[in-house]
Design a protein with these regions (language model features):
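Short, intrinsically disordered terminal tails adjacent to the first/last structured region
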Residues: 1-35, 362-366, 525
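Membrane-proximal helix-loop-helix interfaces that form the catalytic/acceptor-binding platform
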Residues: 3, 30, 37-524
Length: 525
């Protein structure tokens, strides 16, 4: 079987097995063990990614993006579809998948994150299969293991978002493309087109991998001179055309979802930040680049193909982001990490098996510190890691534990509605209060809410226009605001504060937790 114009045995011959004498080197037990492991090259990376994904996956608190996923996926299907008309259309497929998952396994952090862990483990298997397809068993095994060891892979395996499924589908699309280029038959091209369509409905930005596929397909056509490979063009067009409805819906919602992303600059500083944040480790990123360079010395054709997959999507998104909306943020291009791992795997396949094993171990050691940091309780609130950390996060679980320990039947609660609804303090407290409240004591009623987000089909609830009319006879009201606040009125609007004062509520308790302040207001007799 040929691999991008080479016979697989040619690539194997590139490894230093004969010491330059032409006489095969003596095989050792370690070589036999390495070959056995290589034949199962897809299995071991999947297992490693699964173990790393499950390890301490419940320790980090849910952060606002995960809480948004929980909010949408917890709605009835009819409400979820209606909500997509206003926001979250591009994530609708993931929300529907998560909705079904929650119906079976529940909505604990561990349960919801397990879906992403399984997707990332499957992605590791696909990375190994792509590496094996290109450069043989050992390259596949090394590619998959390196991928599983990248800290950002574990980080987003533990994220209740669409990133891990997108990485899986994108890597599967690359594998299907390689199979179609090897044997350009209509069924194989249709499978590739269907996978692209699925990718678009999983994550529109992940379709940037098609830029890499175009470059790779051109290279293969140049190598092989097989005109049947031109069927790539209609296959890709079919897959992309199927995504037009979701692209149109997403474009109308872009300002509300990604308006915070700055237009990227062409500076080295900007790209250095991008690289560090893409891998969640400066040292691992450096190691992968070094190993990627080594790949060019053993199989430059395969290296060129995969380098296109690693770089072309980034360039494409950078160019698109010069327009009205910017999509240039590292986690949106997580789909390129697999390509860097495959380059590293091809480079490692040139080395003696023992040296390659040591190199993989070095990658693990280099990323060990980052692997621990991304499992800290507040780690998911550090989207710019390894830049911008320092312990800051919103301790929703701590605030909920405090409220639940002091709560009484009939209490009301007000979440910060002033200036920063995107902090999702309400979602965070509601999620953890539902798990912490004592038996027989209901979760405090959310005051000043005219419609819940599910009822309104929006991301945020609709506030009462006349707050005084929304107050009941609650003898006590909890107010939860962001940061270290001195007064509950810093967290509420002027109209809400006026309504509370008119009912003669006085502050009787203040509790500061990480990132939040909890006030208890008691009505004067």
């Amino acid at each position: 079987m040929t691999v991008a114009g080479y016979a697989r045995e040619d690539l194997a011959a590139a490894r230093p097995d004969d010491n330059g004498t032409g006489i095969p080197a003596r095989r050792t037990a370690f070589d036999d063990l390495a070959d056995l492991a290589a034949r199962l090259s897809w299995c071991w990376p999947a297992l490693l990614a699964l173990v790393l994904g499950l390890y301490q996956m419940g320790r980090p608190e849910l952060w606002r993006d995960e809480l948004a996923s929980w909010s949408f996926a917890s709605r009835p299907v009819s409400s979820l579809i209606a909500s997509a008309r206003h926001t979250g259309a591009t994530q609708l497929a993931y929300y529907l998948l998560l909705h079904g998952w929650i119906a079976v396994f529940g909505d604990s952090a561990d349960a919801m994150r397990t879906l992403s862990v399984l997707a990332m483990a499957a992605a590791a298997a696909c990375v190994a299969l792509v590496g094996r397809h290109l450069a043989g068993d050992r390259a596949g095994l090394a590619s998959g293991l390196v991928f599983a060891l990248v800290p950002s892979v574990s980080r987003f395996a533990q994220e209740v978002r669409f990133y891990a499924p997108a990485v899986l589908v994108a890597t599967l699309a690359t594998l299907l493309l390689l199979r179609a280029l090897d044997q350009p038959t209509v069924p194989r091209w249709l499978a590739y087109a269907a996978c692209l369509a699925l990718l678009g409905y999983t994550d529109l930005v992940a379709l940037s991998v098609v830029a890499g596929h175009v470059a790779g397909a051109v290279l293969r056509l140049w190598y092989d001179n097989d005109r049947r490979q031109l069927l790539f063009l209609p296959a890709a067009a079919i897959g992309l055309a199927a995504c037009l409805p979701i692209a149109v819906a997403g474009a109308s919602q872009a300002n509300g979802q990604i308006g915070w992303i700055a237009r990227p600059s062409p500076t080295l500083t900007a790209f250095a930040f991008f690289g560090r944040n893409l891998f969640y480790s400066t040292s691992v990123a450096t190691a992968l680049i070094v190993l990627a360079l080594l790949a060019w010395t053993v199989a430059w054709r395969e290296a060129a193909f995969i380098t296109a997959l690693a770089i072309a999507p980034v360039v494409a998104v950078w160019l698109i982001s010069q327009g009205p909306h910017s999509y240039f943020f590292p986690r949106y291009l997580l789909v390129t990490v697999g390509a860097w791992a495959i380059l590293a795997g091809i480079g490692l396949s040139r080395l003696d098996a023992r040296i390659a094993a040591v190199a993989v171990l070095v990658v693990a050691i280099l990323g060990a510190g980052d692997q621990q940091v991304i499992r800290e309780p507040g780690a998911h609130d550090w989207p710019a890691y390894p830049v911008g950390t320092g312990g800051d996060y919103n301790d929703f679980a701590g605030a909920a534990t405090f409220v639940a320990g002091q709560a009484k039947a009939g209490d009301g609660i007000v979440y910060q509605s002033k200036k920063a609804p995107w902090l999702m303090i309400g979602y965070g407290l509601q999620y953890y209060l539902a798990r912490d409240m004592p038996h027989g004591v209901p979760v405090p009623r959310d005051l000043f809410i005219a419609q819940t987000a599910a009822q309104a089909g929006t991301l945020y609830p609709v506030l009462c226009k006349h707050p005084a009319a929304c107050l009941g006879a609650e003898p006590r009201i909890w107010v939860v605001g962001s940061g270290r606040q001195k007064s509950p009125y810093q967290a509420v609007t002027a109209a809400q504060g006026k309504a509370l004062r008119a009912e003669h509520y006085q502050v009787t308790l203040i509790k500061h937790v990480q990132g939040l302040t909890v006030f208890l207001l008691t009505r004067e007799p």
